[in-house]
């Protein structure tokens, strides 16, 4: 017989043996599984009444024990018998009672419970009005900068300021804005102010002035006016008027200032909510710090911005509308 045929026959026989062995093993495992399942069910059914009886016995023993504790001395023998017959259960009840006693917490009437107080965050209130400039610079946030709109800060900075504007004698005249023309009423008691105005009108003055007046039968609200001045970088300072410094530091040189054209020419910040004025005056003393032409351009832009925000009109020293030609004339005076 050929060798290949022999090998094929042996392989088929081995395969049949493996298949038969697998079928036999599977049947044996199934039979064991069903047998265990039947045994488990049978044992459970047998055990169930035993457990119920045990639980009933335990409950009955516990009730008997409690009843025996309440009996008189005449029943001591029966109590001792019940105690001896149910000693494990009594031991369990005693342990439960000890644990219950340990869990009891006694609190005296006058004692207060101990609470764990959580530390609460309380923001620190810093009185910036009572701080000096050096302390402000150390405590201020570099990203935030100095809040120049704070009234207390402005008052303190104004007290420290050593700068002077004009001749410390400048007061601004009142004005009446009529339908046909704009006229200014000069205060009679301020002779020094009259001299400054006359010199300004004659062209012999060392001041350059611009006026921003309200429309007819209207006025500038104090809150709106101060808000606009703060946004433009003005700082309330000496003589109770606003000044535009080189920077936000009040110790820096003054470029130009803003005053009230109504007597006495100051701004009452304490009653700023009730403050109204018909106009303001922007003035710059010559020569000014730095580039005079650049400073004058800055003052002109500030006047136009104030007039735009407050719905006012920019007027020259000669009480004329400030137009492009007037602006060129102003710039020619300092060039």
Curated annotation (Swiss-Prot):
Superkingdom field: Bacteria
InterPro entries, per database record: Cell_div_ZipA, ZipA_FtsZ-bd_C, ZipA_FtsZ-bd_C_sf
Subcellular location: Cell inner membrane
Keyword entries, A-Z: Cell cycle, Cell division, Cell inner membrane, Cell membrane, Membrane, Transmembrane, Transmembrane helix
DNA-binding keyword on record: no
Positions in the Cytoplasmic compartment: 26-335
Transmembrane stretches, start-end: 5-25
An example Gene Ontology biological process: FtsZ-dependent cytokinesis
CC per GO annotation: cell division site; plasma membrane
Chief site of localization: membrane
Periplasmic topological domain: 1-4
Topology relative to the membrane: Single-pass type I membrane protein
Described purpose of this protein according to its UniProt entry: Essential cell division protein that stabilizes the FtsZ protofilaments by cross-linking them and that serves as a cytoplasmic membrane anchor for the Z ring. Also required for the recruitment to the septal ring of downstream cell division proteins.
NCBIfam families documented for this protein: septum_zipA (TIGR02205)
Assembly notes: Interacts with FtsZ via their C-terminal domains.
UniProt similarity note: Belongs to the ZipA family.
Protein name: Cell division protein ZipA
Species this chain originates from: Histophilus somni (strain 2336) (Haemophilus somnus)
